[in-house]
């Protein structure tokens, strides 16, 4: 800040600046996609391993902040429960909050999930994304994007989002999309938030799912009781 490189010496302005520097070292979006597709032809896991490492090495996923998160498991009557406290999202300082209030509202990108975030320089009320890359996917015959969450709630926490800025909607097609994804990446799980406020996801304005390479305690819980539904006896 003393040299005039930063408007203020705060985490918001430091993030904008170091992301701008990282942009000089990043492979172009098309190069990342090409490398991913080459590795995917050998193994889907090799492709995601490469992409996840790139997302960390580029500082898009800030490992030094993720390390501050607190995670533990506790036993319960229904099995173990995973608990995590996310401490890696940077707190905005008062000067950045004041600047954001005075800043002209651009409306671009429309939200934090839109594909237009790739390469975006950012502003005080929107993170810089010059170090951000996405992988295009075809899901349910429509264009979607695959990326990692910069805050990583669990291992290889990924986000799969519609290329169109459409609102969240749980319907029959939702399950088709989920199954299409795990056919592409059988080593991952994927799920959907509810399309309702409060109990749903934090960005209901943009259709998306969340997945990753992690086994939750719920997946390891023993069966309490089994039953069948008439007409669907083959479903377990």
Show where each model-derived region lies.
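Helical scaffold of the NTase/Pol beta-like nucleotidyltransferase catalytic core
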Residues: 131-133, 163-190
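Short C-terminal domain-edge/linker segments immediately following a structured domain
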Residues: 112-118, 179, 191-193, 221-224
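Conserved His + Asp/Glu catalytic blocks
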Residues: 169, 187-190, 196-202, 213-236
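Active-site-proximal loop/helix of nucleotide/amide-processing enzymes and allied scaffolds
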Residues: 205
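Short acidic (Asp/Glu) patches
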Residues: 128-130, 193-196
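Hydrophobic side chains in beta-strands
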Residues: 85, 148, 192, 211-213
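Active-site microenvironments that recognize anionic phosphate/pyrophosphate groups
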Residues: 1-160, 164-167
């Amino acid at each position: 800040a003393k040299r005039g490189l930063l408007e203020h010496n705060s985490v918001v302005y430091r993030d904008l600046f170091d992301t701008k520097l990282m942009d000089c070292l990043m492979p172009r979006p098309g190069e990342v996609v090409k490398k991913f597709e080459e590795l995917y032809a050998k193994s889907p896991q090799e492709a995601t391993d490469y992409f996840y490492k790139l997302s960390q090495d580029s500082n898009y996923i800030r490992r030094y902040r993720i390390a501050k998160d607190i995670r533990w498991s506790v036993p319960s009557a229904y099995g173990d429960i995973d608990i995590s406290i996310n401490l890696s999202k940077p707190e905005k300082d008062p000067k950045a909050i004041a600047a954001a209030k005075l800043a002209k509202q651009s409306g671009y990108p429309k939200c934090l999930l839109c594909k237009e975030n790739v390469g975006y320089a950012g502003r005080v009320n929107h993170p810089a994304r010059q170090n951000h890359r996405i992988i295009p996917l075809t899901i349910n015959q429509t264009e979607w994007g695959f990326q990692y969450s910069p805050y990583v709630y669990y291992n290889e926490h990924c986000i799969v989002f519609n290329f169109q800025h459409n609102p969240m909607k749980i319907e029959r097609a939702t399950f088709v999309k989920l199954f299409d994804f795990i056919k592409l990446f059988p080593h991952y799980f994927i799920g959907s938030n509810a399309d309702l406020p409060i109990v749903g996801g934090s960005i209901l304005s943009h259709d998306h799912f969340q997945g990753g390479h992690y086994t939750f305690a719920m997946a390891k819980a023993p069966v309490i009781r089994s039953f069948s539904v008439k007409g669907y006896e083959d479903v377990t």
